[in-house]
Design a protein with these regions (language model features):
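Conserved catalytic-core motifs of GNAT/GCN5-like acyltransferases
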Residues: 270, 286-308, 433-445
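Conserved GNAT acetyl-CoA-binding A-motif
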Residues: 120-121, 259-273, 404-414
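A conserved beta-strand-loop-helix scaffold within acyl/acetyltransferase catalytic domains
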Residues: 165-168, 172-240, 368-377, 384-389, ...
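Conserved ATP-binding N-box helix of the HATPase_c
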Residues: 38-63
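A short helix-loop-beta-strand connector motif used in the catalytic cores of GNAT acetyltransferases and
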Residues: 57-67, 195-207, 211-217, 232, ...
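Conserved acetyl-CoA-binding loop-helix of GNAT-fold acetyltransferases
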Residues: 100, 238, 244-259, 266-269, ...
Length: 494
């Protein structure tokens, strides 16, 4: 049985060093009860106390202070696991930890240190019931907090450059300082996933790196799907210790230069609405509000140093910035959405001819893909082509997803499809409301994004918009959602 599969018989949470002795004694007593000799149990007690001490010394964001100690045993080994949700350990720190030296001296038979993404830092300390020492270890920590008085100088000295795959552990630590373990994209806590995204081109990132190699800022753009032509910009992370010194602007400027050089049609973004900073930065470089994703961000997502109201799930502002030349297109939209569609196209300065007649699909089958984000509580459905079976297909998808109780389901419809207007009406009958428009998202053109929100509360009172255009769009999106929601509650599927 692997150590991860062993069921704990004892679990303690330590929040202060004064409890070290009690935790160590509990481990020692449990070890002796399992047949480990008292002198070996005492050594195990010592290394566990040291591990807890090291965890408590690591930097923690609010609400993540506790260190969990669990004990499990099977027929061959006695396992103590120490877990914390503090600053992620990086591979060079563990080699310098005092606990590692104790392990090498035989205080444990097996010793493994690891950062396991959103599960946090995990140390497995094992005593074999038939001792067979083969110490094994893998990770590390080296970091000193920046003096607040020197933050401006540090920002000035930061090297703004393209991110390399080897920077992945540093990005994870920077992300932790901003969000703890609450960031909704779990892949950004996974060094291998980050490296894959960079290597395959699904993500292109810019980082701010201090002279000592520490990453203190990140911004980039990523493609939802490999064949997309307009990436999502964002994933903005700036070390809270260095905010207020225009590091975001420097990062974004380099990111935008790279997008221009690579011939990207445009970039879209999801900006938080618990504060207006991200929206203002996007608008300052030519982005335009094109929608709002209501209740798309769980309350568990918290930003260090920013307001984090917990009155319900938070909303995200959709923005789009044209980068290259965008040619004219004809879009199929229902009559009641033509006005908002025309307004947004005019604001972006791109030509869109609107066709509002309802055209029945010609193809028999709908091309649809789905992506589930369990950590975020969201589902994304994307229709590549509208078929005659859309009504049935959409109903089947919703029934299949019902057991997951998703917080929100987003549905993308291809506006270049002559039957898109008909598809919108079908989607509305299934509880989807207008959320926004993303031009040139795919090689086939623009998509309409619709939203179907679960039964969780939405925080409508704390949606902060950077300007009046955003406020007007917010009000429109809320009104559309209320219209569809009333219809759904009445059971109206006409």
């Amino acid at each position: 049985m692997g150590v991860e599969e062993m069921t704990p018989s004892l679990e303690l949470t330590i929040i202060h060093e004064s409890s070290l002795g009690a935790a160590g004694e509990a481990v020692r007593t449990s070890a002796i009860a399992r047949g480990i000799r008292p002198e070996r149990a005492t050594r195990l007690e010592s290394i566990i106390e040291e591990l807890i001490r090291e965890s408590l010394l690591r930097e923690a964001v609010a609400g993540e202070e506790g260190v969990t100690v669990s004990v499990a045993c099977d027929e061959s080994s006695f396992l103590v696991t120490v877990r914390d949700h503090r600053l992620p350990i990086t591979p060079s720190e563990a080699r310098q930890l005092p606990s590692r030296r104790l392990a090498k001296l035989g205080f444990a038979d097996r010793f493994r240190v690891g950062f396991e993404g959103q599960s946090g830092n995990v140390i497995y300390c094992e005593a074999l019931l038939a001792s067979n020492h083969d110490g094994d270890l893998d990770l590390h920590l080296r970091d000193e907090d920046a003096d607040a008085d020197e933050s401006a100088a540090l920002v000035e000295a930061a090297d703004i450059r393209v991110m390399k795959p080897d920077d992945a552990p540093g990005l994870i630590r920077c992300l932790y300082r901003c969000y703890g373990y609450s960031y909704p994209d779990a892949d950004l806590y996974d060094a291998n996933a980050i490296r894959r995204a960079l290597t395959t081109g699904l993500m292109r990132s810019i980082v701010a790196v201090l002279p000592d190699g520490e990453i203190v800022g990140h911004v980039g753009y990523a493609y939802e799907e490999a064949t997309d032509t307009s990436p999502e910009s964002g994933r903005l992370v700036v070390d809270p210790r260095l905010r207020g010194h225009h590091l975001t602007e420097r990062l974004s400027a380099v990111r935008n230069e790279i997008a221009d050089l690579l011939g990207v049609s445009g970039m879209w973004a999801k900006a938080v609405t618990n504060h207006p900073v991200s929206q203002r930065l996007a608008i300052a470089i030519g982005s335009v509000e094109v929608g709002m994703l209501l209740g798309a961000q769980p309350v568990e997502v918290t930003q260090v140093g920013q307001p984090n109201p917990d009155d319900g799930w938070r909303s995200l502002m959709l923005l789009y910035r044209a980068v290259g030349e965008i040619g004219p297109r004809t879009l199929s939209v229902p009559e009641h959405l033509a006005e908002i569609q025309s307004l947004l196209a005019d604001r972006l300065g791109i030509t869109r001819v609107l066709a509002t007649e309802l055209v029945a699909p010609e193809r028999p089958r709908t091309a649809m893909r789905s992506h589930v984000n369990p950590a975020h509580g969201s589902v994304h459905l994307r229709v590549g082509a509208v078929g005659r079976d859309l009504e049935v297909r959409l109903g089947h998808e919703l029934r299949s997803l019902a057991r997951l109780r998703p917080g929100v389901i987003h549905l993308d419809l291809p506006l270049g499809d002559q039957s898109a207007a008909e598809a919108v009406l079908i989607a509305e009958r299934h509880g989807f409301a207008w959320a926004g428009w993303i031009p040139e998202l795919t090689a086939d053109g623009d998509v309409l994004r619709l939203q179907r929100i679960g039964d969780h509360p939405i925080d409508f009172d704390n949606i902060v918009c950077a300007r009046s255009e955003g406020e007007a769009l917010r009000d429109y999106v809320v009104a559309e959602w209320q219209r569809i929601n009333r219809r759904r509650l009445r059971g109206d599927t006409s």
